Amino acid sequence: MSNTCRIVLFYLITCIFTCSASDAPKVRVNSGDIAGGYEYTYSGRKIYSFLGIPYASPPVQNYRFKEPQPVKPWLGTWNATIPGSSCMGPDYESNFKLVGQEDCLYLNVYTPKLPRENTPDDLMDVVVHIHGGAFMSGEGISLGPQYLLDINNFVYVTINYRVGVLGFATTGDNILPANNGMKDQVAALKWIQQNIVA
């Protein structure tokens, strides 16, 4: 391939990535700027998606068995085009193989309209999906927006929360307090309440 073809190909690829990055939907939440993407419902309706948004700090190391801590602000723009990891637990569909990570307190937001398209009189309802799994397994991304937002106009949010031992083990004292997975859910709901109009 000649150098001229390589240069033209390089500029073409650069233009494609630059155009798609500048076309990304952007919002600002309390922790910083977020750039999302697009998805399509079953009937082909285009919706905005913001995936893998942290609603609390990662519950790792000294915070492993503690209640969720506030998310720290980030510099730059958060890439919200990739779902955050599911929380660590068994995958019942693959012979109880352990899946997920400890750094898992993320949520996903799907909406047919961005806030700048809404007037105060045109705000949408918010539906939050908290996955099941007997507090042992599951992930927020398991029920996507493809059907729910096909003809409905509301903001749809899914969350991850700690499951199993990391979310619900307790020693009955302050060393290992109970129900951190439930406290994760409350932290996610508070984050949604404070940031969803972004």
Curated annotation (Swiss-Prot):
List all disulphide bridges recorded for this chain: C87-C104
List the InterPro entries. Answer: AB_hydrolase_fold, CarbesteraseB, Carboxylesterase_B_CS, Type-B_Carboxylest/Lipase
Glycan-bearing residues: N79
Where in the sequence is the signal peptide annotated?
1-21
Molecular function terms in GO for this entry?
A: carboxylesterase activity
- What are the record keywords, sorted? Disulfide bond, Glycoprotein, Hydrolase, Serine esterase, Signal
EC number(s) stated in the UniProt entry for this protein: 3.1.1.1
Q: According to its UniProt record, which reaction does this protein catalyse? A: a carboxylic ester + H2O = an alcohol + a carboxylate + H(+)
One Pfam entry for this protein is COesterase
State the top-level EC class.
Answer: hydrolase
Q: Which Gene3D superfamilies match?
A: alpha/beta hydrolase
Q: Which family does it belong to?
A: Belongs to the type-B carboxylesterase/lipase family.
Miscellaneous comment text of the record: This esterase confers organophosphate insecticide resistance.
The UniProt function text for this chain reads: Overproduction of nonspecific esterases is a common mechanism of resistance to organophosphate insecticides.
Classification via PANTHER family: CARBOXYLESTERASE (PTHR11559)
Q: What is this protein called?
A: Esterase SG1
- Give the species this sequence originates from: Schizaphis graminum (Green bug aphid)
Query: What is this protein's gene name?
Result: SG1
